[in-house]
């Protein structure tokens, strides 16, 4: 995830935190220990939270063309990294598997913005930003929700996309939150994720000097993320994957806190079929099976990765979550095709970048990968092999 991009300059304002220890962090997994981790996602829980103080909040919409050739994402970042002034930014990625030279990355600050409920508007030199949650009806006639995303803030990119929820959304547990603080009943920070693991995407993408791209019920994924503290104080590294195929979808989100919070790890996820959410997990795992050093910056970058997500089916009662017949397991393992390395602090002047790295121990890079991968799924006594598209990120902060 682009968490560090959302608040990179905040590294310039403070040093590493004191060593509070693991006892000053409470993973969301604790709230569901011995219980079904599935938490339903109500409409009010799609609202922007806008926490007080330093924070970063995002809505990110991913799309995959059904032919596997094109992928991208649209992200709105609403942040207050210094706890002083809110800012907003629109980022857009479009990658073409057949013509990588035509890949597009765009980032634009927006003004006069307003997050209200689940919606977001901003004025711009063109038509601005207008993201609105609207009632919708899926192909089977069932009532659902959709985000209508219209963005035109530069000559480079114009978007008109509708992301319609295909299966149940979810969070982990009753709140979806991990908490930071010496008094966890009154935490000074929090991390929260909520997901639409599978969506249908239709609409148009217009990029300068390129043919208009049309999506028609292609694959989509949505995540709403909130960090109620400075990004480099919340996590030292991240792993993320979303998998999409005609039959199945999966997501795993993994992060490790800095040593100031005991290098605690949170790994959550969920798996869906084309028809319904199957199971969620508060104890998923991620392994960098093979790595290669990025000699320029020193990080060990994964070249072969394994994500494992196991948990009870969403309709299983708490007392029955450990019964084998009530559980599902999914494994994503394969080689990674490098898409891009993002130097988060590249635009900060060299002397400030050096200062930030010295003071905060930060050298944040995001490694993005995009390729096909096989999904191994075990559920209801069946072993299923599936093949689909993945987008994966490995983020190193400190």
Curated annotation (Swiss-Prot):
Task: Please describe what this protein does.
Answer: Ceramide-binding protein that may transfer ceramides from the endoplasmic reticulum membrane to the cis-Golgi network membrane, and is thereby required for the biosynthesis of complex sphingolipids.
Q: Name one GO biological process term.
A: ER to Golgi ceramide transport
| InterPro entries noted in UniProt | Ceramide-binding_SVF1, Svf1-like_C, Svf1-like_N
Where is the major localization of this protein? Golgi
Membrane topology of the entry? Peripheral membrane protein
GO cellular-component term (any): cytoplasm
Taken from the record, one Pfam family name reads Svf1_C
GO molecular-function terms, A-Z: ceramide binding
Gene name, please? SVF1
Sequence segments annotated as region (Peripherally associates with membranes): 1-18
Q: Which UniProt keywords apply?
A: Cytoplasm, Endoplasmic reticulum, Golgi apparatus, Lipid transport, Membrane, Nucleus, Transport
Q: Where in the cell is it found?
A: Golgi apparatus, cis-Golgi network membrane; Endoplasmic reticulum membrane; Cytoplasm; Nucleus
Q: Which named protein is this? A: Ceramide-binding protein SVF1
Family listed? Belongs to the SVF1 family.
- The domain of life is Eukaryota
Q: Give the species this sequence originates from.
A: Yarrowia lipolytica (strain CLIB 122 / E 150)
